A protein has these predicted regions:
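Acidic/polar-rich alpha-helix caps and helix-coil junctions
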Residues: 5-23, 33-284
Length: 284
């Protein structure tokens, strides 16, 4: 599957101030919060996660503390206010009244975050648009295989040391501490291992089309931490004009509906009508 810098995907990942990008490929706060800290622990467990809001100077810019000391995959996946765009090295801001604010264009990231993953870091200006750059689409990759293997072992043999070994193959490449070093006690604890595998899949495979199916095959789409329905949050794109600090207030973006029937797709009526032995999926 071919993708290029001039394609709709790249445009939706590009800020409006950078060659009038569409900047609509937004990332939810819930995904942002699921990335680990640089010590390999979740934000709920890590002492590095700030107890109070505030800012830290990074490259001369005030960066919100919640985005400091995160793992490398966070910085490669999420584009946030104050980060520099790789083409012209411009600082990008999204607050209301900024160059990329909701008052400047109807195309704005609803959550105040842009997807950065898969954005080509080597694009340069060519007239009014970036150069075309071939990027293959991700269908199946080695990290997915490693985590599926760890998942199978978790369900069949939770004391098998290969579980941590294969999760750690992914974590090592990601540049974060290994579970064998920081959480060896979870080996043999099936529930803890399930959570470890699932959290790793959430982060490593984010925006690759896996999460939708993962939470359904695990039958956890109504469980805290995995919910596909309910309230979803982001940064405040509609604060007072020019008020940069108002942007950092987390606000409700949308309420989604998930019902039990959504664990399975409905069988098309045309197929059900072919045979009276064909039974429609539950609740449809």
């Amino acid at each position: 599957i071919k993708s290029s810098a001039a394609s709709d995907v790249y445009k939706r990942q590009t800020p409006f101030s950078e060659q009038k990008g569409h900047q609509t490929a937004a990332v939810m706060q819930e995904l942002v919060d699921d990335f680990f800290m640089k010590d390999g622990l979740s934000i709920e467990e890590s002492p590095l996660y700030p107890e109070e809001p505030g800012f830290t100077k990074v490259g001369g810019q005030d960066i919100y503390n919640e985005w400091i000391n995160r793992e490398p995959r966070f910085y490669q996946s999420v584009f946030y206010q104050g980060k520099k765009w790789q083409v012209k090295n411009n600082v990008i801001e999204f607050y209301y009244g900024s160059k990329n604010g909701a008052d400047k264009t109807s195309n704005f990231p609803a959550t105040g975050y842009l997807l950065f993953k898969r954005t080509c870091r080597k694009l340069y200006n060519q007239g009014s648009s970036p150069k075309v750059q071939y990027r293959p689409s991700i269908i199946f990759r080695l990290a997915d295989f490693y985590l599926l293997y760890a998942e199978v072992l978790t369900e069949t043999d939770p004391a098998n040391p290969k579980i941590l070994e294969y999760i750690d193959k992914v974590r090592k490449r990601a540049g974060i501490p290994l579970l064998q070093d920081i959480r060896p006690e979870i080996l043999g604890n099936q529930e803890a291992l399930r959570e470890a595998v699932r959290r790793e899949r959430r982060v490593e495979l984010c925006t690759e089309g896996q999460r939708f199916f993962d939470v359904r095959r695990w039958m956890v789409a109504e469980k805290d931490g995995y919910k596909q329905g309910g309230d979803f949050y982001g940064m405040n794109m509609f604060g007072p004009n020019g008020d940069r600090n108002a942007f950092y207030k987390k606000v409700l973006i949308e309420n989604r509906i998930f019902e039990k029937k959504n664990y399975l797709y409905p069988i098309p009526l045309s197929q059900v009508q072919i045979s009276n032995q064909m039974v429609q999926n539950p609740l449809w």
